[in-house]
UniProtKB/Swiss-Prot annotation:
<comment type="similarity">
    <text>Belongs to the polyribonucleotide nucleotidyltransferase family.</text>
</comment>
<dbReference type="Pfam" id="PF00013">
    <property type="entry name" value="KH_1"/>
</dbReference>
<dbReference type="InterPro" id="IPR003029">
    <property type="entry name" value="S1_domain"/>
</dbReference>
<dbReference type="InterPro" id="IPR001247">
    <property type="entry name" value="ExoRNase_PH_dom1"/>
</dbReference>
<feature type="binding site">
    <location>
        <position position="492"/>
    </location>
    <ligand>
        <name>Mg(2+)</name>
    </ligand>
</feature>
<dbReference type="InterPro" id="IPR012162">
    <property type="entry name" value="PNPase"/>
</dbReference>
<dbReference type="InterPro" id="IPR012340">
    <property type="entry name" value="NA-bd_OB-fold"/>
</dbReference>
<dbReference type="InterPro" id="IPR036612">
    <property type="entry name" value="KH_dom_type_1_sf"/>
</dbReference>
<dbReference type="GO" id="GO:0000287">
    <property type="term" value="F:magnesium ion binding"/>
</dbReference>
<dbReference type="InterPro" id="IPR020568">
    <property type="entry name" value="Ribosomal_Su5_D2-typ_SF"/>
</dbReference>
<dbReference type="InterPro" id="IPR027408">
    <property type="entry name" value="PNPase/RNase_PH_dom_sf"/>
</dbReference>
<feature type="binding site">
    <location>
        <position position="498"/>
    </location>
    <ligand>
        <name>Mg(2+)</name>
    </ligand>
</feature>
<dbReference type="GO" id="GO:0006396">
    <property type="term" value="P:RNA processing"/>
</dbReference>
<keyword id="KW-0808">Transferase</keyword>
<dbReference type="InterPro" id="IPR036345">
    <property type="entry name" value="ExoRNase_PH_dom2_sf"/>
</dbReference>
<dbReference type="Pfam" id="PF03726">
    <property type="entry name" value="PNPase"/>
</dbReference>
<dbReference type="GO" id="GO:0004654">
    <property type="term" value="F:polyribonucleotide nucleotidyltransferase activity"/>
</dbReference>
Length: 705
């Protein structure tokens, strides 16, 4: 049955329509906001045997027809998803995943297909709401619904779902998702925004989210299918007690080993011994293979529960963390710059057993990344790429192209540094930072942010302020709340909230928060962000002990950038027909040249000499030719009425036969030949811009001198 519902959001109409399209999916909805239209489907298949995780897939599919264009690829089809699409898929996945039942092993796939784009209404936030509606309408077990909005900060005012013009001026790009009772996810990039403003923005977002959730609850009541009844295999109290008795003291001791690899090895040994013990017991009890494997899965699950309980108890009741630290204690920090001799800038940031090497490369304007997408074509001159090789955790695995995690962490690091990157007018280079994770025990994305700051300053990039990042955790048991600074893997896994905060001394530049429980109040969040600020400033102080400001000079191996400005109508003189002149300059000098439409010229040279040569040629090309100027020109062409002489690269004038010499000249070839260099004087520039020259007058001028 076809139905639709509409709600006012930030002055626009958000509409959800079902029962008309994609009806074979478990749940489907067409979501509209302004002229932006997204089809979102939710589908479930049979459970996968033998897996110990929930197989949720979220795909965000951009279609170029949504903006009335044909793809530019050879096949004229869309290719692999852009990073923006991958980030949108992660944005949808993160708040939804915790809301599926524990132990649910059915494949669930959510596909958001962008059908039409209105630049004032962003499709990713519409897709997030659409995904929740599709799940609410479906028979898939789901503890939702959720809503999501964006918040901007324009002229000091917080704005819900800012339009394109407002986004351009905004100091904040915040996305918040949550249920009626709690915020579940926060993702933000900001221009040094204070913690108080960030909290106000999150609170404002949650007020709007509540309205969206109420509408979705109404949608579920009116058109939702009966939910699939899922029952999880439950362990018997007797077996649960026996497992706990068998592993309790050993596991407690193992989890208190400070060193990660040693601790993991001991935990793995306990798991292996426990599984072997109970496998033998099940066989002695006469269980068949199917039942035995089923029971062993429950043993594994109970071991995991025991680990979680013990880690949480240790932290909440004793105030001690697995590596022996206090809740607010940050691991030992060690930094280094100038690590690699031939690169343009490098830095290593180490915090405990987490280590990142960041490397800066400076390039030309033409090295900017071109962003083809569902909107105006843009370029990006600051890029941060994050690599997470298997050796960083002491494992082996095939090396593949960057996955969602690498893309997400790279984008977070990029967002954190973007507000402090100098403007192109001040520093005209394209900047690429690559962060290689060398060791990992939690918080690698924040280590890459700190490493990026060190490397940028080592490269001599005049960043406005140094940036540091820290990963925080939170555990809540009844009314007791413990906030953890600089979390490691176990604390992230067993905690109730993890949040990553990056920024300068002046404010936040990036924030990522995932909350797994209800009941996190504004006061708790305020306290957590205050602790994060203290940790961030402590880390900044440690970093600045190694390098306290950008180096005054670039690396000798970095290219030299020379900028100059020419009149826009002179650009054609530099480029020449078919790029002939600019290519000749590049071949002769070995430089790279980029020209903007406003007449800005960027010359990237490996040394000062070649850069100056290119600049000199361009100056000659763009120099205004004036009557009375004298040039040393080369004869390019001879006709029966005169000779054409090149006075500047690509600029020619005519020396009429009567202007070649003081005496009568019968043949032009009697005076000049092709290739001769001769002095000429500009005697006229006609209304068409044609230049008339004189050899005889130039010679007279030279004699006077």
């Amino acid at each position: 049955m076809h139905k639709d519902w509409t709600i006012d959001v930030a002055g626009g109409k958000m509409k959800f329509e079902t029962g008309k399209y994609a009806k074979q999916a478990n749940g489907s909805v067409v979501a509209r906001y302004g002229d932006t239209t997204v089809l979102v489907t939710a589908t479930m298949s049979e459970p996968r045997e033998g897996i110990d995780y929930f197989p949720l897939m979220v795909n965000y599919e951009e279609r170029v027809y949504a903006i009335g264009k044909i793809p530019g690829s050879i096949t004229r089809r869309e290719g692999r998803p852009r990073d923006v699409a991958t980030l949108a898929a992660r944005l949808i996945d993160r708040p939804l995943r915790p809301l599926f039942p524990e132990g649910f092993r059915h494949d669930v796939q959510i596909i958001a297909t962008v059908l039409s784009v209105d630049n004032d209404c962003e499709p990713d936030i519409l897709a997030l709401n659409g995904a929740s509606v599709a799940l609410t309408l479906s028979d898939i077990p789901f503890d939702g619904p959720i809503g999501g909005v964006k918040v901007g900060l324009v002229d000091g005012e917080l704005v819900i779902n800012p339009d394109e013009e407002e986004r351009e001026k905004s100091k904040l790009d915040l996305t918040v998702a949550g249920t009626r009772d709690a915020v579940l996810m926060v993702e933000a990039g900001a221009n040094e925004v204070s913690e108080d403003v960030m909290l106000d923005a999150i609170e404002l977002a949650h007020q709007e989210i509540k309205r969206l959730v109420l509408l979705q609850e109404e949608i579920g009541e009116e058109a939702g299918k009966k939910k699939f009844e899922f029952t999880k295999d439950e362990i018997t109290p007797e077996l649960d007690e026996e497992i706990r008795k068998y592993i309790s003291s050993d596991m407690e001791n193992a989890l208190r080993i400070p060193e990660k690899l040693e601790r993991n090895a001991k935990v793995d040994e306990i798991k292996e011994n426990t599984l072997q013990y109970f496998e033998d017991m099940f066989e002695n009890n006469g269980l068949d293979n199917e039942e035995k494997n089923k029971q062993l899965k429950m043993v594994e699950r109970t071991i995991e529960k025991v680990m979680k309980e013990k880690v949480r108890k240790m932290i909440i009741e004793e105030g001690i963390r697995p590596d022996g630290r206090k809740p607010d204690e940050i691991r030992p920090i060690w930094c280094e710059v100038g690590t690699l001799p031939r690169v343009h800038g490098s830095g290593v940031f180490t915090r405990g057993q987490t280590q990142a090497l960041s490397v800066v490369t400076l390039g030309a304007t033409s090295d900017e990344q071109i962003l083809f997408g569902l909107g105006e074509e843009e370029t990006k001159r600051y890029m941060h790429h994050y690599n997470f090789p298997p050796y960083s955790v002491g494992e082996t695995s095939p090396l593949r192209s960057p996955g969602r995690r690498e893309i997400g962490h790279g984008a977070l690091g990029e967002r954190a540094l973007q507000p402090v990157i100098p403007d192109q007018e001040e520093f005209p280079y394209t900047i690429r930072v690559v962060s290689e994770v060398l060791e990992s025990n939690g918080s690698t994305s924040q280590a890459s942010i700190c490493g990026s700051t060190l490397a940028l300053m080592d490269a001599g990039v005049p960043i406005k302020e140094p940036v540091a990042g820290i990963a925080m955790g939170l555990l809540k048991e009844d009314e007791k709340v413990v906030i953890l600074s600089d979390i490691q893997g176990l604390e992230d896994f067993y905690g109730d909230m993890d949040f990553k905060v990056a920024g300068t001394r002046n404010g936040i530049t990036a924030l990522q928060m995932d909350i797994k429980i209800h009941g996190i109040s504004k006061e708790i969040l305020k306290k957590a962000l205050k602790r994060a600020r203290e940790g961030r400033l402590y880390i900044l102080d440690k970093m600045l002990q190694v390098i306290d400001k950008p180096r005054p000079e670039l690396s000798p191996y970095a290219p030299l950038m020379i900028t100059m400005k020419v009149s826009p109508d002179k650009i054609r003189h530099i480029i020449g027909p078919g790029g002939k002149i600019i290519n000749k300059i590049i071949d002769e000098t070995g430089v790279e040249i980029d020209i903007d439409d406003d007449g800005s010229v960027y010359i990237l040279a490996q040394d000062q000499e070649s850069g100056n040569r290119a600049k000199e040629i361009i100056n000659k090309l763009t120099k205004e030719v004036e009557v009375g100027d004298i040039y040393e020109g080369r004869v390019k062409k001879i006709t029966n009425f005169g000779a054409f002489v090149e006075i500047l690269p690509g600029r020619e004038g005519l020396v009429h036969i009567s202007e070649l010499a003081d005496h009568h000249v019968k043949k032009v070839e009697d005076i000049v030949k092709i290739g001769d260099r001769i002095p000429v004087k500009v005697i006229e520039i006609d209304e068409l811009g044609r230049i008339n020259l004189s050899r005889k007058r130039a010679l007279k001028e030279q004699k006077k001198e």
